[in-house]
A protein has these predicted regions:
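Non-catalytic pre-domain segments flanking phosphatase-related domains
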Residues: 1-13, 30
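The start of beta-strands in P-loop NTPase/AAA+ ATPase cores
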Residues: 9-11, 67, 179
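Hydrophobic "anchor" residues
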Residues: 18-19
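Active-site phosphate-binding/coordination module
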Residues: 26-114
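Conserved acidic, metal-coordinating active-site core of Asp-based
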Residues: 100-195
Length: 198
């Protein structure tokens, strides 16, 4: 008789619009309780969000989830029982791109007041994002603009929730095939694209 080895599964879950009340703000406590029960059953529950990795890590600590969080749309991973940061993005590139579009657009372009970021810039939704991306590409900036539905995010090219999740899975030493992703916005699509189940 062969025993099947049970592997830990990973549930990668977004915050805003996915586990919040009315899409924004307060955490839906029933959703958090379900996530905790998945973790208590021996699986990993990893927050993957556009918010800061520190906010997500604190939610994982207080919520009883896996002590690892991917924040800033894949730009930073915060993990451990004491905070450890792994920076994947380059905030300097994002700041230079922000300054450039601010100086080349007629619209008022300004940073959104959010929890401080280590690898990205978060902007108010006040300008034409496809036009700005085209201009940045033409000028050779190494960034992508994303619309989360709440804010615009300036991230290093190649950095997104998918690449951040792949780095998190390496840290956890688990297989991609054992991962499920949940989310609700354009910024979650790269995460859906790297997993088989979303």
């Amino acid at each position: 008789l062969r025993l099947k080895i049970l592997k830990k599964k990973v549930l990668a879950v977004d915050i805003d619009g996915t586990i919040t009340l009315n899409g924004w703000g307060s955490i839906h406590l029933d959703a958090l309780a379900k996530l905790r029960s998945i973790k208590d059953a021996g699986n990993h529950v990893v927050i993957v969000t556009g918010r800061s990795s520190v906010e997500a890590w604190l939610l994982s600590i207080f919520g009883g989830l896996t002590h690892l969080a991917v924040g800033e749309n894949g730009g930073c991973i915060t993990s451990g029982d004491t905070m450890h940061h792994k920076m994947l993005g380059n905030k300097g590139d994002c700041l230079r791109a922000y300054d450039f579009i601010k100086n080349h657009f007629n619209e008022e372009i300004k940073e959104k007041l959010v929890f401080p970021r280590m690898t990205e810039v978060v902007l108010e939704r006040t300008f034409d994002i496809p036009r700005a991306q085209k201009l940045l590409d033409e000028e050779g900036f190494n960034v992508n603009l994303f619309d989360s539905g709440y804010t615009y995010h300036v991230n290093t090219k190649g950095i997104d929730k998918g690449s951040g999740l792949l780095n998190a899975l390496e840290i956890l030493n688990v297989d991609l095939e054992d991962t499920i992703a949940l989310g609700d916005s354009e910024t979650d699509v790269p995460m859906f694209n790297v997993v088989k189940n979303s």
